[in-house]
Amino acid sequence: MCDVVLGSQWGDEGKGKLVDLLCDDIDVCARCQGGNNAGHTIVVGKVKYDFHMLPSGLVNPKCQNLVGSGVVIHVPSFFAELENLEAKGLDCRDRLFVSSRAHLVFDFHQRTDKLKEAELSTNKKSIGTTGKGIGPTYSTKASRSGIRVHHLVNPDPEAWEDFKTRYMRLVESRQKRYGEFEYDPKEELARFEKYREALRPFVVDSVNFMHEAIAANKKILVEGANALMLDIDFGTYPYVTSSSTGIGGVLTGLGIPPRTIRNVYGVVKAYTTRVGEGPFPTEQLNKVGETLQDVGAEYGVTTGRKRRCGWLDLVVLKYSNSINGYTSLNITKLDVLDKFKEIEVGVAYKLNGKELPSFPEDLIDLAKVEVVYKKFPGWEQDITGIKKYDDLPENAKNYLKFIEDYLQVPIQWVGTGPARDSMLEKKI
C-alpha cells in the first residue's frame, strides 16, 4: 500500500521534513510529478542534503527511489543533483530509478520559459515561474510532440536518429515562435549522446516497478511536489504550475489504481505563504507579513525569492481537503507564531456582502473577496523543540483544535522548530 505526502496550500509547506521522518521506515520512495522547480533540504546528522528532482528516500540506505512517469527531467540537473548527494557521502546510484515514460526537459525549454515570462511581464501578466522549463515541457507533452526517456536510451541505432529528428523539430518550432534565440542545438545534442549511455542504467518500466512493489507488500511513500493550490486544474489558474499536484497526479504520474492508496498526509504551514504572482486573499502587506517572513525565513530553496506571507486560510484548506481527502495533517512551523499577541485565521469569504459557499474559481471574484477572520490569543512563549502535544501552551492547542474541527481532519504531527527532530506526533 502507498502513503502519500501532499502540499495543501501554495507550496513550501515543509513536505520534505515529514517525508524525511517517514523515510526511516519505508522500502520505496516515489516522485510522481513536477521537476526541479521545487526544493527542500534534509539534514541527517550534521550533513545537509538538497533535493529538487530526486526522491528524498535516497537518505535511507535501504530505500529504493523512483522518478515517476509524471515527472519532467532535465538530465543535466538530474546528474548534478545526484553528484552533489554523492559528494556528501550518499551512496545511492544503485537505489535510484527513472521511468522510461517520463518526459525530458531541454535547455531550449528553459530558454523559451524565460522568454515567455519576459513577454508576459511587459503586459503585467507574469506567472512568476522558476524558469526551469517545466511549463514548456508539459506543453510539448500535451501537444504530443514531447520526447520521453525511452526515446533517448533505446540502444537501437534507429532510435537515436529518431531522437535527433524529434529534437530538431521541437527546436525549429521554438525558433519560428521566438526567432533566432541564443541557443546551440548541436552542442546540446552532443551532450545528450553522452547522456544516452549515462542515463540508461537508471531507466525502468515504472508501472511494472510500482506494481511489483505493491504485490510484494512493500512500504511505499509517494512524495508530492508543489501543492494543491498550484494544480493545473484545481489551483488558482493561470497562476499555477503545469502538472497535477493533487491526489490525481499521484495516480496518473505513477500508473497505480486508487485502491492502492492508504493514507494521504496533508502538509499545512501554520500560516500561509506564496511565491510569485497570483491571488492570495489572506496576504498581509504589513508588519505581520514582514514578521512572518523574517521569523519563518521565508525564502525559496530553488529560486531564493522572498515568499509572500499571510494568515492561515481555512477556506483554501477546506477546498484542498475536498479534492485530496487528507486522512491526517502535519501542521508545520507553529513556532513561527510564538511571539504574536494575537493570531488571525481566515474562516470564510464574502463577495458583495454574501458569504461564498466554496473557494471561487474566477480570479476576478477572488480578487474582490472580503476575508472573514477569527481571532485567537497568541501563546507568546517559545515552543521550539517541544516533543509532546500536552506540553504545548493551551492557546497553541486551542489554535490547532480549531483547525481540526473546521476541517474535520485530525492533526497527526506538529512542527515546533527548524531542527530535524523538532516534530511532535499526536495520537489520533
UniProtKB/Swiss-Prot annotation:
PANTHER family: ADENYLOSUCCINATE SYNTHETASE. It catalyses: IMP + L-aspartate + GTP = N(6)-(1,2-dicarboxyethyl)-AMP + GDP + phosphate + 2 H(+). It is found in: Cytoplasm. SMART domains: Adenylsucc_synt. This is Adenylosuccinate synthetase. GO terms for molecular function: adenylosuccinate synthase activity; GTP binding; magnesium ion binding. InterPro entries: Adenylosuccin_syn_GTP-bd (IPR018220), Adenylosuccin_syn_Lys_AS (IPR033128), Adenylosuccinate_synth_dom1 (IPR042109), Adenylosuccinate_synth_dom2 (IPR042110), Adenylosuccinate_synth_dom3 (IPR042111), Adenylosuccinate_synthetase (IPR001114), P-loop_NTPase (IPR027417). GTP binds at residues 11-17, 39-41, 307, 333-335, 415-417. Binds 1 Mg(2+) ion per subunit. IMP binds at residues 12-15, 37-40, 130, 144, 226, 241, 305. Plays an important role in the de novo pathway and in the salvage pathway of purine nucleotide biosynthesis. Catalyzes the first committed step in the biosynthesis of AMP from IMP. GO terms for biological process: 'de novo' AMP biosynthetic process; IMP metabolic process. Mg(2+) binds at residues 12, 39. It comes from Candida dubliniensis (strain CD36 / ATCC MYA-646 / CBS 7987 / NCPF 3949 / NRRL Y-17841). It holds the Pfam family Adenylsucc_synt. The active site is at 12 (proton acceptor), 40 (proton donor). It comes from the Eukaryota. The lineage of its organism: Eukaryota, Fungi, Dikarya, Ascomycota, Saccharomycotina. Homodimer.
